[in-house]
From Swiss-Prot:
Catalytic activity of the protein: alpha-D-xylose = alpha-D-xylulofuranose
S-S bonds: none
Family of this protein: Belongs to the xylose isomerase family.
InterPro entries linked: Xyl_isomerase-like_sf, Xylose_isom_bac, Xylose_isomerase
Cofactor notes: Binds 2 magnesium ions per subunit.
Residues given in the record as Mg(2+) 2 binding sites: 269, 272, 308, 310
Active-site residues (renumbered): 102, 105
Gene: xylA
Protein name: Xylose isomerase
The protein's Enzyme Commission number: 5.3.1.5
Main location: cytoplasm
Entry keyword set: Carbohydrate metabolism, Cytoplasm, Isomerase, Magnesium, Metal-binding, Xylose metabolism
Gene3D superfamilies per the UniProt record, alphabetical: Divalent-metal-dependent TIM barrel enzymes (3.20.20.150)
Database matches in NCBIfam families: PRK05474.1 (NF003998), xylose_isom_A (TIGR02630)
Length: 438
């Protein structure tokens, strides 16, 4: 674009607690060393293309409010190139290491799949050229298999195998572009992989179709030499009444059933967790416990609303517990913190995009530093070890190691003087302890 979009022109930098009114980081000092790694390398922030650059500000009761110049015109590819110019300027101003995108975020759909793929490859060429002189890299790419009307009954789970085939072609193109751009992961989100009513749904058939589709993606990943994991993103509902990737536990069962645990991990989102009736902390902790944690879509939902509001993450105590869980198990590998979040409909100034990201990056940094302090002090890990210390002893190890039968345990329980007593869970103490850090 020839016209300047953002008022800001200087990349946002760390200024500390005395920062003035201009955009600045008060907590996010990217070069600060925490547990031997730079804060930037721990948090691995990514800006998402769709909410930041594609969303027009509409809702079910009203149309667009943002009036982005690249949303209007007669040349769709020219609009896509203009959008890319603003995107990479946003990445530069925020000084983020990563971005993410869907295929149709970046390039317009054509009259055929072949035309859509050609458009995507042309914009990928542009991305490649821009990345050659920029800091930003690709955290992950994905294909949009939920917006077009052909996918109203799903993509992989569609009753029509021709639509399954079309979706396969779309994913192949998106996966190959992700690989070409050096993407570190590839995401599959099944927004329409579910049902509206069981009256017209064959559950077993659709689950088998979904398992086969993900297996095909894994096979192609290996064929082209893509080394990153495939990530599935749990969500219980919206847009469908019930989605097959309901939550972490459901996804784990699906991956185990179709022998996909080796190659597929999970991309977990806060707003999706609360829609499933879980806390963000629960979903991350369970994914870590089951060995399927991959990455985070960091945002927040409104606890009083029953839909995906995708607000920017600002809840430091909530984030601190999540980061404590991740840091305690070694931190991110290929994953990161993707801002799957959108500014509010009334936030119509272009620089609102900058303020939103800066505020959320600072909240994440503040939470991460608190998590590191808690971990260093053993604030939560020491009480946890104490709570389960019996299982680290000889008898606990013997039980878990298969050296005791049910009869062995029953005989011991029936023995004289065997009267184990409960101990306090100390929940209130632990909650107050967390508050000392956040």
């Amino acid at each position: 674009m020839s016209a300047k979009f953002f008022e800001e022109s200087t990349p946002v930098a760390f200024a500390g607690q005395d920062a003035g009114p201009a955009p600045a980081f008060r907590w996010y000092d990217k070069d600060r060393l925490v547990h031997g790694r730079r804060l930037e390398d721990h948090l691995r922030f990514a800006v998402c293309y769709w909410h930041s650059l594609c969303w027009p500000g509409g809702d079910p009761f009203g149309g667009e409010t943002f009036l982005r110049p690249w949303h209007h015109g007669t040349d769709a590819m020219a609009q896509a190139r203009a959008k890319a110019d603003v995107a990479f300027e946003l990445f530069r101003l925020l000084d983020v290491p990563f971005f993410t995108f869907h295929d149709v975020d970046a390039a317009p759909e054509g009259a055929s799949l072949a035309e859509s793929v050609a458009n995507l490859n042309a914009i990928a060429d542009l991305f490649e050229a821009k990345m050659a002189s920029a800091k930003v890299r690709l955290l992950w790419g994905t294909a949009n298999l939920f917006t077009h009307r052909r996918y109203m009954a799903g993509a992989a789970t569609n009753p029509d195998p021709d639509i399954f085939t079309y979706a396969a072609g779309q994913v192949r193109a998106a996966l190959e572009v992700t690989h070409r751009l050096g993407g570190q992961n590839y995401v599959l989100w099944g927004g329409r992989e579910g049902y509206e009513t069981l009256l017209n749904t064959d559950l077993k058939r659709e689950l088998d179709q979904l398992g086969r589709f993900v297996s095909l993606v894994v096979e192609h990943k290996h064929k082209i030499g893509f080394n990153g994991p495939i990530l599935i993103e749990p969500k219980p509902k919206e847009p469908t009444k019930h989605q097959y990737d309901f939550d972490v536990a459901t996804c784990y069962g699906f991956l185990a059933r179709y022998d996909l645990l080796k190659d597929v991990k999970l991309n977990i989102e806060q707003n999706h967790a609360i829609l499933a009736g879980h806390s963000f902390h629960h979903e991350v902790a369970l994914a870590e416990a089951l060995g399927v944690f991959g990455s985070l879509d960091v945002n927040r939902g409104d606890d009083l609303l029953g839909w995906d509001t995708d607000q920017f993450a600002m809840n430091v105590p909530e984030l601190a517990l999540v980061f404590h869980e991740i840091l305690n198990r070694g931190g991110f590998t290929s994953g990161g913190l993707n801002f799957d979040a959108k500014i509010r409909r009334q936030s119509i100034d272009p620089d609102d995009l900058i303020h939103a990201h800066v505020g959320s990056m600072d909240a994440c940094a503040r939470a991460f530093l608190a998590a590191a302090d808690m971990l260093d002090a053993g604030a939560l890990t020491a009480p946890l070890d104490k709570r389960y210390e019996g299982w680290a002893g000889p008898e606990g190890r013997a039980i878990l190691g298969g050296q005791r039968s049910l009869a062995d345990l029953a005989d011991r329980a029936l023995g004289p003087g065997f009267d184990p007593q409960p101990r306090s869970g100390r929940q209130e103490y632990l909650e107050s302890l967390v508050n000392r850090y956040v």
